């Protein structure tokens, strides 16, 4: 291949050499713009020429908007390559290309082909994009038209709302004339659809867009096409850009109006003026419990807590929002703020638990409940054993009843009668009171040979307080010294008049030993029950009273319950005092397991979480949630009462601190465990009565059940004794007590327990010191002996003087020394005693200030042990 080499030939050229200049493309003008209300404004309008790249092209002819033109794929003109032949008239000698030049030219040609193929693919893709762009623009035009219509509708609605708001503002604030411009009727201007891009045809028949120009590569390689820049995004309207054009400035349709944001701000201001008007205060019903925090009270009233605190400060009380105030103060604050108050109490959880009215159409007769009361050893339990054909007395320790018991018997006429046996000992006053409260009839047993005794009088008072009828059973008429008439006469002193003496109280002479007149006694009880007309609803939830409670090692907490209303069934959820549970088993007085217990039936109930207190009322509730509410309230009340009593004790101790220090009161610490709640209650009452100002029993812990290791640990900490009443200690507790030296005492009879504790407490009492006068002696002369010291020469004037006795040295009727007589001599001999009228020598222990004329008084001190 040959080529010409012409020094003047420039193969790499973009075009003819031209000078680069910047021509002004901006034309300016001034336009006067008019606004509403006669306002005008001078506006500078600039007109910019269109910048063209790649030379001047002929102007494009616009195409009608109704006839959109579909863009055609641009044609890429191919410029013919320059001929490789040498110029004929160049006159230059040709030479052969070197191997490197041929290789470079071959590489350049290959690269040019690759670039040409890439440019062809790019051009085809650009043509396809332009074809799809027309369809997209059509869809955009339709969407713009829909948006325009929606915007016009929104403008119309906002104008209407603005007009109504202005009218409302004028009416509310009484404006004389409107400040806002009258509502302008929005005219719907039909805007022409934006015209399609005109398809300008070039002079040579090519499309509007200029074909990519080819740029030659250095070295004579194939030309590389220059890709035209992509069209910029569609500019926003001039109004949105915030500047005016000549066309928009001269147009009358684009008069500036209030913006939407301005209208919204005005609406907000109007709403703010309306919100500043005084609001009508809402009166609320405020529920006020017994205690409430200030924050909670403010929340319930929908008031600020600061306002509540301010009102409290006016009353002279400084509080925080977390402080608790009482119900009275909360009610005063709520009423002062204009609210109504509804007082509630925590005890409202117990409403409807007891004493619900029964339907008179479903009531049916029930068995009477009879309580046997009287003095100790008058034969109450023996009489009940004779009626039941049982032998309960033999099972009682000491032959006295120390537990309250409930039994059910059948009378000769087939009716059932429930008996409650109460102890007669003075310590069981609370048991007798409980028996009188749950009973329908009281049988007062009086021994014919003993008459009316203190516990008999107490039983009469219990029956009168409970307002229940009495039947007098004069027992032990089989004894030779029985005097029933004396019993009737003594009862008159306590306002009990029997039928035989013109009264209304039934009396029956019986003998429990010989079973005399027992049928007559049961007949009188049935007659009295018929007069009372006892009826109840057996189908309602059960209510009853806990007669006795204990902690059984094998069965857990066990409560003896007398069902008074309704029917108690296995599985019922029950509440008694601060304890709750589900009935696991019901055991009758005969020891049989039953499924239910009706009215007036005594049963043992198993299933409590803990042993309830004797005397607590039992009720069946609907679910465990209600049971937990009731028991938690009662437990809280119990803790508060205990805290109040302890704080009261602390206050009294602080007030009497000086007296306690001088008196030196001593405590006798005890840990007491009993078998049942009633016995424990009786023991605590008896020990409390033993206390004096000098010594008292301090009960560290009292409970029901056996003695455990924790009881021993507690007793060890306070060096206390442990008392077990009808209970025993387990192996661990016994071993711990033996190891730590803790004394455990067991008792079965209550008065033995009380007597032993009384003796032990008496040992803590300070003994009484009693002085016995022996005689007087007068000092005649004082001698000073080197080994002994001063010795007084005395004459005994009265009684006698003994060596080692207590003496007082009296000078001018004032006691100057008290001590002991260390030396007593007659002449030179030590003697034990000197009689009246004799002279002797005396010396005191550690005292030598003796003078002539002093009187020595000699006496003996005796120590006498005291007892409670």
Swiss-Prot record:
Region (G5) location: 511-513
Low complexity: bias regions: 57-76, 179-203, 223-239
Domain tr-type G intervals: 365-535
Compartments reported by the entry: Cytoplasm
Sample GO molecular function, one term: guanosine tetraphosphate binding
Renumbered residue ranges of the record's region G3: 421-424
Chain positions covered by the region annotation G1: 374-381
Alphabetical list of SUPFAM superfamilies matching this protein: Initiation factor IF2/eIF5b, domain 3 (SSF52156), P-loop containing nucleoside triphosphate hydrolases (SSF52540), Translation proteins (SSF50447)
Family recorded in the similarity comment: Belongs to the TRAFAC class translation factor GTPase superfamily. Classic translation factor GTPase family. IF-2 subfamily.
Function, in words: One of the essential components for the initiation of protein synthesis. Protects formylmethionyl-tRNA from spontaneous hydrolysis and promotes its binding to the 30S ribosomal subunits. Also involved in the hydrolysis of GTP during the formation of the 70S ribosomal complex.
Protein name in the entry: Translation initiation factor IF-2
Lineage of the organism: Bacteria, Pseudomonadati, Pseudomonadota, Alphaproteobacteria, Hyphomicrobiales
């Amino acid at each position: 291949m040959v080529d010409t080499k012409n020094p003047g030939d420039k193969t790499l050229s973009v075009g003819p050499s031209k000078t680069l200049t910047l021509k002004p493309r901006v034309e300016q003008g001034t336009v006067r713009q008019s606004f509403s209300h006669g306002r005008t404004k001078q506006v500078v309008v600039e007109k910019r020429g269109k910048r063209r790249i790649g030379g001047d092209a002929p102007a494009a002819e616009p195409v009608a908007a109704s006839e959109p033109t579909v863009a055609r794929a641009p044609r890429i003109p191919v410029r013919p390559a320059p001929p490789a032949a040498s110029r004929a008239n160049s006159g230059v000698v040709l030479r052969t290309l070197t191997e490197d030049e041929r290789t470079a030219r071959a590489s350049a040609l290959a690269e040019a082909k690759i670039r040409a193929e890439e440019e062809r693919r790019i051009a085809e893709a650009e043509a396809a994009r332009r074809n799809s762009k027309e369809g997209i623009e059509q869809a955009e035009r339709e969407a713009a038209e829909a948006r325009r219509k929606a915007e016009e509708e929104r403008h119309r609605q906002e104008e209407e709302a603005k007009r109504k708001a202005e009218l409302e503002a004028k009416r509310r604030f009484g404006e004389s004339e409107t400040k806002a411009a009258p509502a302008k009727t929005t005219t719907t201007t039909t805007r022409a659809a934006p015209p399609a891009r005109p398809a300008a045809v070039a002079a040579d028949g090519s499309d509007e867009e200029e074909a990519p120009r080819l740029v030659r590569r250095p070295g004579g390689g194939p030309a590389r096409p220059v890709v035209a820049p992509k069209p910029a995004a569609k500019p926003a309207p001039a109004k949105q850009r915030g500047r005016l054009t000549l066309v928009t400035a001269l147009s009358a349709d684009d008069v500036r109006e209030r913006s939407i944001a301005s209208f919204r701000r005005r609406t907000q201001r109007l709403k703010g003026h309306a919100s500043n008007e005084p609001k009508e205060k809402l009166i609320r019903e405020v529920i006020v419990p017994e205690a409430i925090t200030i924050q909670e009270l403010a929340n319930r009233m929908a008031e600020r807590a600061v306002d509540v605190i301010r009102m409290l400060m006016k009353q002279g009380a400084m509080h925080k929002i977390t402080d608790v105030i009482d119900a009275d103060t909360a009610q005063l604050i709520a009423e002062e703020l204009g609210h109504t108050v509804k007082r509630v109490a925590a005890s409202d959880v117990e409403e409807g638990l007891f004493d619900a009215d029964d339907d008179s159409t479903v009531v049916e007769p029930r068995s009477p409940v009879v309580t046997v009361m009287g003095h100790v050893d008058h034969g109450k339990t023996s009489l009940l054993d004779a009626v039941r054909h049982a032998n309960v007395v033999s099972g009682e320790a000491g032959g006295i009843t120390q537990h309250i018991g409930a039994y059910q018997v059948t009378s000769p006429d087939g009716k059932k009668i429930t008996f409650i046996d109460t102890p007669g000992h003075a310590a069981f006053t609370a048991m007798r009171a409980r028996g009188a409260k749950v009973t329908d009839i009281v049988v007062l047993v009086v021994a014919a040979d003993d008459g009316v005794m203190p516990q008999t009088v107490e039983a009469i008072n219990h029956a009168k307080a409970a307002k229940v009828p009495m039947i007098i059973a004069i027992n032990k008429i089989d004894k030779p010294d029985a005097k029933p008439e004396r019993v009737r006469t003594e009862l008159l002193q306590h306002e009990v008049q029997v039928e035989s003496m013109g009264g209304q109280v039934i009396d029956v002479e019986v003998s429990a030993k010989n079973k005399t007149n027992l049928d007559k006694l049961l007949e009188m009880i049935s007659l009295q029950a018929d007069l009372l007309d006892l009826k109840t609803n057996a189908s309602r939830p059960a209510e009853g009273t806990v007669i006795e409670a204990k902690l059984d090692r094998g069965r857990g907490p066990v409560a003896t319950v007398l069902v008074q209303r309704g029917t108690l069934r296995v599985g019922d959820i029950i509440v008694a005092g601060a304890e709750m549970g589900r009935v696991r088993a019901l055991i009758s007085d005969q020891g049989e397991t039953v499924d239910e217990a009706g009215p007036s039936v005594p049963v043992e109930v198993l299933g409590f979480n803990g042993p309830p207190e004797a005397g607590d009322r039992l009720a069946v509730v609907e679910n465990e949630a209600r049971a937990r509410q009731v028991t938690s309230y009662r437990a809280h009340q119990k803790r508060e009462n205990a805290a109040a009593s302890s704080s009261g004790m602390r206050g009294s101790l602080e007030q009497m601190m000086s007296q306690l220090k001088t008196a030196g009161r001593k405590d006798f610490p005890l840990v007491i465990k009993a078998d049942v709640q009633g016995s424990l209650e009786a023991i605590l009452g008896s020990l409390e009565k033993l206390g004096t100002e000098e010594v008292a029993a301090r009960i560290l812990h009292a409970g029901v059940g056996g003695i455990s290791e924790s009881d021993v640990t507690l007793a060890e900490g306070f060096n206390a004794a442990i008392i077990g009443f009808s209970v025993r200690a387990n192996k661990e507790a016994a071993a711990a007590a033996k190891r730590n030296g803790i004394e455990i005492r067991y008792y079965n009879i209550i008065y033995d327990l009380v007597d032993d504790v009384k003796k032990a407490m008496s040992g803590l009492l300070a003994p009484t010191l009693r002085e016995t006068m022996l005689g007087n002696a007068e000092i005649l002369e004082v001698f000073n002996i080197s080994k002994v010291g001063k010795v007084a020469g005395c004459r005994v004037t009265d009684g006698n003087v003994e060596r080692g006795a207590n003496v007082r040295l009296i000078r001018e009727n004032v006691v100057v020394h008290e001590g002991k007589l260390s030396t007593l001599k007659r002449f030179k001999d030590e003697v034990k005693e000197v009689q009246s009228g004799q002279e002797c020598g005396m010396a005191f222990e550690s005292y030598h200030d003796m003078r002539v004329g002093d009187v020595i008084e000699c006496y003996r001190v005796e120590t006498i042990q005291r007892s409670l």
